[in-house]
C-alpha cells in the first residue's frame, strides 16, 4: 500500500481522480449521499458567513479550492465581486478554470443565478507559502478551507503558516470557515469498539471508508503530526491525514488574534441549530433529491437480503436507473436518519468552525478589488508560487481527449 504523505504526493493523487462531482458519473457514485450532504453542509456554512457581512460586495479566498466545486455556491450568494482559488494540484486548477468560465458564461446570460464576478487561480501549497505576500494589497471578506485543514496539522510549522495566512488575508469584519475531521468522534468510536488507544494498528472502517493508525499515537497529548491513513471509496485513497486537537486549534487562533465564533461538533448539528440561515435549511431536501432516488434503489437491494459488500450489489444502481425514478415514488430526505448507517458514519466524522478577528478595529483594511467586466481565465493566467514551472504543452497532452477548450488553453 502506497501512502500519500507530502503535499506533492497528495496533489499527484488528486490529479488522477476524475470529476466525480460532475455529470452522470456522480449519479452512479456509491458515495452520492455523502457528496450531496457535504455540498449542502458547505453551502450552509458559507451562507452563515455571508450573513455576517455588512457589505454586499464580497471577496472570497478559497484555500485548497480543488476543482472549483464551491464556485457555484459563491455565485448563488449574488454579491461576490472577486474570487481567488488556491490549490497545490495544477490539474485541479485547470478543471476549476473550466468550471469558472462556464459559470461566467451562464451568469452573463442570466443574472437570476447571480452576478458575474472575476476569479483568479494560484498554484501554491497553502500550508507553507506566505500567501499574504502574494495578495499583499488584498484582504478577503470570506476565507474558506473545506475538507483540507487537517493537512495543515502535520507540524507546528505548517499550522503556523496556514493560520498566519488566514490572519493576514482576512478583512477586519471577515470570517474564516472550515470543515475537517473531529478527533473526539474518532477516539470515541475507537473506545466504543474496545480498542487499546496506547497501541498501534488501530482501525475504524465500514464498506465505504477506513481510518487506520499504523503506529501508536499519544492521543491525550495535543501534539501535531498525529497521523492516520484515510480511505474513502471513489474519493480519497490511502492518504496520510492528521488529527486536529481543538486545544491546538484554539491556541493557534489566540496566537493570531482570532476567535471561534461558531463551532459545530458534527455536521448533523447544522440541520438542528438556529445559527444556520433558514434559507439553507429549506434547501436541504432539494439538494438531496438525487440521494433520495439513490436510496430508493439501494433499499430495494437491501430489502432483498443483499449486502452493500456483495459483488453485484451496485449493478442496478446506475445513472439510467436513477433517472427513471419518478419523484412520486420516493420519500423526500428531510432528516439524516433516513440514510443508511454506513453513510452516517462518514458524515458524522466531520465538524465545522467559523472564525473571526478578535479585535476587528485593530486590523488594517484594504481597498476592495473592483473589476468592472469579469473575464474568462486560461491556464496561462494561473499564478505559480511553487518552484516547478508550468508546462502548458505537457498539460494539453495530459488532458487530450478529456478537455480541449479554447477558453482554457488559448
Whereabouts are the PLM-identified features?
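A short glycine-rich, Lys/Arg-flanked "PGG" loop and its adjoining helix->strand segment in the class I
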Residues: 158-172
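A short SAM/SAH-binding and catalytic strip from SAM-dependent methyltransferases
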Residues: 140-157
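Conserved beta-strand signature within the Rossmann-like core of class I S-adenosyl-L-methionine
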Residues: 173-181
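C-terminal lobe and adjacent flexible extensions of AdoMet/dcAdoMet transferase-like proteins
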Residues: 218-410
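Class I SAM-dependent methyltransferase SAM/SAH-binding core
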Residues: 69-128
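A short acidic, Gly/Pro-enriched loop at the edge of an enzyme's catalytic core
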Residues: 131-143
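Class I SAM-dependent methyltransferase Rossmann-like catalytic core
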Residues: 3-53
